[in-house]
């Protein structure tokens, strides 16, 4: 293993391309990055670490290092990451804080931070048309959680449906049938929920809860020019959201600071572990705890939230977990937040110019040693279709 944090710049691989490369690739929760010729990528010990891409001067967390072909960085075997964009609603739902206290509606069914369909839990009326407007304060995103959701089902939701749009009337989703447990994220100044029923069959309706996901300044790193396999030693403090996880004193995995109290890592890193034996270091550069750069912050873990559908439907599907730190991190030199993936960012799949980076203290080659410092590598994204076969 390296003794310093390593970095590598990787091209993203499109869904189409990734599906061709791996039978266990799950396009609903995974994303690929790496080069066709191999030689660069993540390896043992990099699990849980970040795959970040730059967009308009900010860095966005696109993936959480999950798994790869054997040996590491083989030709046509890109690294596979949990897809943060597809899992963002789940992440936000787990770490939200401030409840929404007012909702404007013409159906008079809102009480504080919950919304129930008319008549709930009994059958909702026929021929209903209700519009609910949820104002979203500045610098927050709204998470709508479906505590219970049962509407008449149809493949296109033609009969009874709940449609969620933003303030620009952009459709975020249209829902019917059984959707209990779903979370929906709205990033705008208002969310509009339209509930429409027809004149025939009905069901018990829905019970929704609303909460805010407060955005902080994120994705800012120092202006620096730079073995994860084939990578380089990362400049000190150049990836301020990089977390180092230790279990019972031994290096375990990487992670990313997404809120002052929350680190996102891979579910397989912490599966079956107790929070009390996991320690998190932020602002670190060296693998060894004996070598410091002066920006380190040390934390206990008080809670682990593993994705409920980890390993479903395929091995390593939904491979994410949240670690709640014992106190908020102090955001200063060497420690900062990474932005969660944003749909505004057009992912640069299959670009010849490398555009995304992964970092960690994983082994420099298959069954090799770990570096002393944090490593980095630039990788291309691989399309889902090419990664799935």
Curated annotation (Swiss-Prot):
Per its UniProt record, what InterPro entries does this chain match?
CUB_dom, Peptidase_S1_PA, Peptidase_S1_PA_chymotrypsin, Peptidase_S1A, Sperma_CUB_dom_sf, Trypsin_dom, TRYPSIN_HIS
- Primary residence: secreted
Endoplasmic reticulum in keyword set: no
Q: Which residues form the Peptidase S1 domain?
A: 1-96, 228-389
What Gene Ontology terms for biological process does this UniProt record contain? Answer: proteolysis
Its annotated compartments are: Secreted
Q: Name one Pfam family in it.
A: CUB
Q: Is the keyword Acyltransferase assigned to this protein?
A: no
Stretches assigned to the CUB domain: 103-213
Q: What is known about the tissue distribution of this protein?
A: Component of the acid-insoluble organic matrix of the aragonitic skeleton (at protein level).
Q: Which UniProt keywords apply?
A: Disulfide bond, Repeat, Secreted
Superkingdom, taxonomy of origin: Eukaryota
Query: What GO molecular functions are on record for this protein?
Result: serine-type endopeptidase activity
Q: Where does the sequence pass through the membrane?
A: none
Gene Ontology CC: one annotated term: extracellular region
All disulfide bonds of the chain are 18-32, 43-72, 157-176, 253-269
What SMART domains is this protein classified in? CUB (SM00042), Tryp_SPc (SM00020)
Q: Which family does the record assign?
A: Belongs to the peptidase S1 family.
| Full protein name | CUB and peptidase domain-containing protein 2
Supply the source organism for this entry.
Acropora millepora (Staghorn coral)
